[in-house]
């Protein structure tokens, strides 16, 4: 890859010549940032009172025209940190030349879900700008002809994955001649998601002198590569929040057998041991359906996120989860667990970044992926634009349940970052398979669990360096074992064929919801709100008795939590509205007959013939 040249045809300088900023002042407010009144009005509407640390530092520097490389985690407000300066610049140019039509902002993201998220932020902040600001999301599933028509009107901002940008540059549908701002969000993921060739081609198409924003949760070798390609002496922002790296997250680990993962999950949700919204991370797509079908046996509703589902369905699931419609999401983090991300040693020493990733940690991750061939290691187009443990902004998550432990401490940190955000507390619970229990229960076994103990050691070591403790959690197995026979009944019903049927059925259902009804839902948004993704798949044999817990199985402390003490009077016969059919029969009995005169029964006997 060639490094980008500056105005004097000299390669851009390294980090030691770049200005570096750490920390953030919290006395700033949006009034001091001199933003356009229309942008401030949008901020007030969205109840943005004070900028977050990354916004307070990045926005003034961006308005000065400096390149920025910012390390800030998901949920820190980094999207607004680059969207607001871009909108401010566009509005200033439109004030001078209202007829200006040119694509001046390009925002690159690794996944479709993140592209949709960024597009919504732009729409929110540009709500009072009228027709002065137009943006387009190129990751939408539309035909090339429709996409070409969208770009023909020269939108001010284009949000896309690198692959879609290159495709539209190749057809001349997209022009970057007037580009002034380039953003690469989740920069550390862009190259590891298989966009290296696209980024290399894009670096040659970007005009000289473009202001660049690189936003990343970590400063890795991938970010260093992008910095060399696109940045000119960037200001490096390393912002530490008080809740960074999971400071507000209580971390627990449970060592158990492979089938006991399902047993403990059943007990946790059926006895309501965890209150609030939960994200369950599993290792692959089959595991997600096995767990969903298992929970269905007990009447526990959940919805699935994986790369097979249509992007519109995935986005809708996240939106509804954030609104509180669903409490449990089962997320298939197959990219990470299967090792599809490229394993590269971090050049943190050159950045001075305390990333705390040891060589041993990289080796452990590499071992878990050693069975994969180089061909398999390359992302398919289906997996390429999907990611769940990074980028997507889940809100108000009470607990992250690592049903399958990730293969590296870095991935673990990203997963638990879904909870305990914005100063709130959260919990992370991880199931770990000891080496002597691995492979004992074939139907529920997963290959990545072979290295659980080694990965756990790295996780504990890394969290200790960050000042956090991973505590063991002990269930009272004498009480849990009482539920074991019910767990065994449920697991036996979930065969491999049932999982295949469930996968096929849900994909068919979601395709109908996503494609055929898209226009209908645009015209009828109320019906979209009623669309649910946590329905029963019914691929496995449902055993009705499993949905109810007999009183003799209930622990003494748990009875009050999930049952009402005063049941009230229950009559032998139904008296409520559900008995309307019987009442109607009683009312209608005798109707329709002709009213006759009263007959004396003693005078109705006919005398027989002699």
Swiss-Prot record:
Q: Return the motif ranges for DEAD box.
A: 185-188
Query: Where does the record place the Helicase C-terminal domain?
Result: 248-478
Q: Which SMART domains match?
A: DEXDc, HELICc
Q: Which InterPro entries match?
A: DEAD/DEAH_box_helicase_dom (IPR011545), DEAD_box_RNA_helicase (IPR050079), Helicase_ATP-bd (IPR014001), Helicase_C-like (IPR001650), P-loop_NTPase (IPR027417), RNA_helicase_DEAD_Q_motif (IPR014014)
* Entries under Pfam families matching the protein: DEAD, Helicase_C
**Recorded GO CC terms:** nucleolus
Q: What molecular function terms (GO) are annotated for this protein?
A: ATP binding; ATP hydrolysis activity; DNA helicase activity; DNA/RNA helicase activity; RNA binding; RNA helicase activity
Key words, A-Z: ATP-binding, Helicase, Hydrolase, Nucleotide-binding, Nucleus, Ribosome biogenesis, RNA-binding, rRNA processing
Provide ranges: composition bias, Basic residues: 582-596
Q: Family per UniProt?
A: Belongs to the DEAD box helicase family. DDX56/DBP9 subfamily.
Name it. Answer: ATP-dependent RNA helicase dbp9
The source organism is: Emericella nidulans (strain FGSC A4 / ATCC 38163 / CBS 112.46 / NRRL 194 / M139)
Encoding gene, per UniProt annotation? dbp9
């Amino acid at each position: 890859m060639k490094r980008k040249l500056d105005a004097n045809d000299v390669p851009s300088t390294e980090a030691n010549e770049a200005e570096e900023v750490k920390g953030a002042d919290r006395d700033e407010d949006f009034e001091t940032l001199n933003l356009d009144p229309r942008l401030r009005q949008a901020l007030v509407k969205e109840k943005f009172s004070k900028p977050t640390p990354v916004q307070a530092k990045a926005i003034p520097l961006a308005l000065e025209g400096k390149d920025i490389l910012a390390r800030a985690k998901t949920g820190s407000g980094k999207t607004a940190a680059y969207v607001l300066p871009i909108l401010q610049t566009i509005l200033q140019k439109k004030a001078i030349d209202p007829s200006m039509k040119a694509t001046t902002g390009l925002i690159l993201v690794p996944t479709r879900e993140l592209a949709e998220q960024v597009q919504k932020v732009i729409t929110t902040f540009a709500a009072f700008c009228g027709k002065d600001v137009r943006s387009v999301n190129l990751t939408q599933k539309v035909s090339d002809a429709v996409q070409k028509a969208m770009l023909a009107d020269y939108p001010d901002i284009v949000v896309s994955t690198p692959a879609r940008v290159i495709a539209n540059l190749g057809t001349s549908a997209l022009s970057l001649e007037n580009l002034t701002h380039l953003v690469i969000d989740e920069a550390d993921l862009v190259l590891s998601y298989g966009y290296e060739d696209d980024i290399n081609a894009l670096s040659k198409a970007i005009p000289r002198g473009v202001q660049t924003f690189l936003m990343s949760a970590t400063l890795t070798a991938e970010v260093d590569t992008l910095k060399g390609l696109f940045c000119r002496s960037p200001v490096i922002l390393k912002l530490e929040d008080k809740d960074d790296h999971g400071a507000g997250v209580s971390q627990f680990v449970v060592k158990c057998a492979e089938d006991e993962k399902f047993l403990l999950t059943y007990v946790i949700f059926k006895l309501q041991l965890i209150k609030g919204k939960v994200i369950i991370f599993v290792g692959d797509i089959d595991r997600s359906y096995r767990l969903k079908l298992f929970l269905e046996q007990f009447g526990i509703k959940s919805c699935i996120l994986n790369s097979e589902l249509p992007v519109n369905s995935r986005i809708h699931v996240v939106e509804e989860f954030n609104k509180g419609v669903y409490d449990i999401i089962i997320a298939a983090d197959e990219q990470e667990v299967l090792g599809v991300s490229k394993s590269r040693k971090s050049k943190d020493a050159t950045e001075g970044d305390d990333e705390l990733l040891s060589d041993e940690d990289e080796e452990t991750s590499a071992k878990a992926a050693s069975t994969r061939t180089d061909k398999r290691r390359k992302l398919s187009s289906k997996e390429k634009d999907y990611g769940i443990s990074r980028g997507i902004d889940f809100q108000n998550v009470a607990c992250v349940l690592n049903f399958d432990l990730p293969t590296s401490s870095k991935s673990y940190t990203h997963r638990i970052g879904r909870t305990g955000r914005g100063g709130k507390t959260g919990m992370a619970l991880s199931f770990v398979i000891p080496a002597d229990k691995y492979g004992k229960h074939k139907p529920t076994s997963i290959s990545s669990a072979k290295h659980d103990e080694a990965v756990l050691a790295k996780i504990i070591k890394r969290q200790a360096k960050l000042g956090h403790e991973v505590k063991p959690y002990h269930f009272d197995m004498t009480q849990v074992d009482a539920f074991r026979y019910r767990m065994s009944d449920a697991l036996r019903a979930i065969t491999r064929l049932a999982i295949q049927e469930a996968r096929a059925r849900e994909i068919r259902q979601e395709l109908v919801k996503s494609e055929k009804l898209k226009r209908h839902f645009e015209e009828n948004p109320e019906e979209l709100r009623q669309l649910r993704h946590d329905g029963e798949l019914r691929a496995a044999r449902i055993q009705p008795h499993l949905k109810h817990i007999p009183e003799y199985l209930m622990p003494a402390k748990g009875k009050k939590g999930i049952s009402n003490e005063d049941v009230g009077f229950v009559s032998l016969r139904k008296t409520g509205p559900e008995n309307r059919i019987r009442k109607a029969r009683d009312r209608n009995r005798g109707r329709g007959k002709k009213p006759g005169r009263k007959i004396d029964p003693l005078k109705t006997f006919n005398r027989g013939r002699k």
